A protein has these predicted regions:
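Short helices/loops that flank or line small-molecule/ion binding pockets
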Residues: 97-111, 184-185, 229, 243-249, ...
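Extracytoplasmic/periplasmic substrate-recognition and gating elements
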Residues: 159-164, 226-230, 380-385, 403-493
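Glycine-rich, aromatic-lined ligand/substrate-binding cores of catalytic
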Residues: 340-355, 365-403, 416, 442-450, ...
Length: 589
């Protein structure tokens, strides 16, 4: 059942072509902080910064670095980095494309990219500047700790001294996710009731009889983690309960899911599949996807059953499975996990049952869908939004937060409560107290800053760039970043939670601290020497699949609308043993 794996070059090409649908934002914006370009003939030392056109630039988000650059420029206005020059001039641009193929001749000095930043590969070709001094400043001067997985990604090629030095710095991260409307869940009683609840609401639906909480007396179940008194209480603990919840929401006139619409928007659907996959699998064995293996066997799919279907949907056969211990010999089976198939199957079930909001069926932008989800529609309220965890600040900045203003006006001033959703950890039944699994987050959007090695040729410019990076990674500027955008950089800095000003990011901080977070980083050379083959963000290998020998670039949801099945996508996106052997050979070089 192994299909042709989507190779590195194709992954990169698709990542680039999908950038426009990623966050629907134009590239090439240029913002100088001074009065000139900082070129050789200018009166100031110039620093050119290029950001990936993404969540850190969208809807005015780029202001975080514009403001930081302005503060640094003011601080250094009287400092001379180069003979005959005084002060610095920082030019900030953003673009969909980071020019990896032409770094040696590119005019930018500092870059920020999501997911694809590959310090090992580009330090090996001597195109990146070593950043050990900045890392030392963060850890020794600022007394901060960088996340261990982030540090793995920051390491470059083995140098002449036999050491791997740092060539990148961690920036914001985001995970695959669903966001649920806490207000809606509370008002409509969409939480599962605890088994011995005195008051509850019984629902006899398509997937059996189930008890939900009484909104007036919410006695919630223990949720997917199997522990009472935690953030996931009352949320579906199994995919069976998730189906029961969606069926109940639809029976009450609501829409379980909303997602940016149309063929383009459905590329967001991988967020749902990968989030469910990680939650079902759990961190211990899910780490195999970055070649960090466990001795615990993994359940993998070997075929499909006749006459047995996924929650009765005759378009979705149940799989035949076996247990396998993954290692460098069997690592090609990492994408064969039964949990990945079940996640794909659940999205097909959602499509087959029309569990998507009507706006999903038209070519509706992310901004419009987010507005609908936040402000709500009395005629068709959406319970859950499918997107990465980056989405919230984009919505807050869009149209000056008009959706939140509308909510406040129509709700009588109630707090808008939206939250990252902990997802099911088992296939069927209900998780009993003490039997659940910790929430697993799949951080696929790790971004990094890195520096063009050309900067090293000019001692004055190198000092200016180094000082600017130290400034950005000071405690004060790290705090300013999060207090403005709400997003987190994987360093243990403090910030004023009150400045976040909303339920989503304050609750997310707690949820993240309680979760197992899996980042695309590893000590295994098969991973870090083949990074592009392990990327699971936008444009990653599993976003696409082969069907009848053709690479299909539509998103999962659009594929289901076009008649494809979970089985089609699953079998068309596994990793062949032959390709895996090539990756192993690359790791030995």
């Amino acid at each position: 059942m192994k299909s042709k794996f989507i190779k590195k070059a194709l992954c990169g090409a698709m990542a680039l072509c999908m950038s426009t649908t990623l966050i629907a934002c134009g590239g090439g914006n240029k913002t100088p902080t001074g009065g000139n370009s900082g070129g050789p003939s200018s009166a100031e030392t110039g620093i050119n910064v290029l950001l990936f056109t993404g969540t850190a630039t969208r809807n005015g988000a780029i202001k975080w670095i514009q403001d930081a650059a302005a503060r640094f420029t003011e601080l250094k206005k009287d400092e001379s980095y180069e003979s005959g020059k005084k002060g610095v001039d920082i030019t900030i641009q953003d673009n969909k494309l980071i020019p990896y193929d032409s770094l040696s001749s590119d005019g930018n000095d500092i870059y920020l990219d999501e997911a694809k930043a590959d310090m090992y590969t580009y330090s090996a070709s001597n195109e990146l500047m070593q950043l050990d001094e900045i890392v030392s400043y963060i850890e020794n001067d600022q007394k901060l700790t960088i996340d261990a997985d982030a540090k793995k990604r920051m390491l470059g090629y083995e140098s002449a001294d036999g050491q791997r030095h740092y060539y990148g710095l961690p920036q914001y991260e985001w995970s695959n996710s669903l966001t649920y409307d806490v207000n809606y869940f509370e008002d409509a009683g969409l939480y599962f009731a605890k088994p011995d609840a005195i008051k509850s609401v019984t629902y006899e639906g398509k997937y059996g009889t189930v008890k939900f909480v009484d909104p007036a007396d919410m006695q919630k179940s223990c949720g997917p983690d199997g522990a009472y008194g935690t953030s996931d209480d009352g949320l579906p603990s199994s995919l069976e309960e998730f189906a029961q919840l969606c069926d109940y929401i639809k029976s009450q006139g609501g829409s379980p899911f909303i997602i940016p619409g149309g063929a383009g928007g459905s590329v967001y659907s991988f967020h749902m599949v990968q989030a469910i996959w990680a939650a079902l699998e759990g961190a211990e064995t899910m780490k195999s996807i970055k070649a960090e293996y466990s001795e615990t066997p993994v359940e993998v799919v070997t075929g499909f059953k006749d006459g047995e279907y996924f929650f009765g949907d005759k378009n979705i056969p149940m799989p035949i499975t076996e247990k396998v211990v993954l290692n460098d010999t069997t690592g090609y089976k990492m994408y064969d996990m039964a949990s990945r198939y079940y996640a794909l199957a659940f999205m097909q079930l959602a499509n087959d049952n029309d569990w998507f909001h009507s706006e999903t069926k038209s070519d509706t932008s992310a901004d419009k869908v987010q507005t609908t989800f936040i402000a709500t529609n009395a005629n068709e309220r959406a319970a859950m939004y499918i997107d990465g965890t980056y989405w919230y600040h984009e919505a807050k900045l869009y149209n000056k937060g008009a959706a939140f203003t509308q909510w406040k006006r129509t709700s009588g001033g109630k707090e808008r409560k939206l939250s990252y959703m902990c997802l099911p950890t088992t296939l069927k039944g209900s998780v009993a107290e003490g039997e659940g699994k910790k929430n697993t987050m799949l951080n696929v959007g790790s971004s990094f800053m890195f520096v063009n090695n050309r900067v090293s040729e000019n001692a004055g410019k190198k000092k200016a760039v180094t000082d600017f990076l130290k400034f950005l990674y000071s405690k004060a500027e790290l705090a300013a970043f999060t207090e403005y955008l709400g997003m987190n950089i994987p360093i243990n800095y403090d910030y004023d939670e009150k400045k976040l000003g909303d339920y989503y990011y304050t609750s997310f901080k707690k949820l993240r601290s309680e979760a197992d977070v899996i980042t695309a980083a590893s000590d295994n050379p098969v991973q870090y020497k083949n990074l592009s083959s392990f990327i699971l963000g936008f444009g990653g290998a599993l976003n696409y699949y082969t069907y009848n020998g053709q690479v299909m670039m539509e998103g999962y949801l659009q594929a289901y609308r076009n008649g494809r099945t979970a089985k089609d996508i699953y079998t068309g996106s596994t990793l062949s043993e032959a390709i895996w052997k090539t990756l192993l050979e690359n790791a030995k070089k």
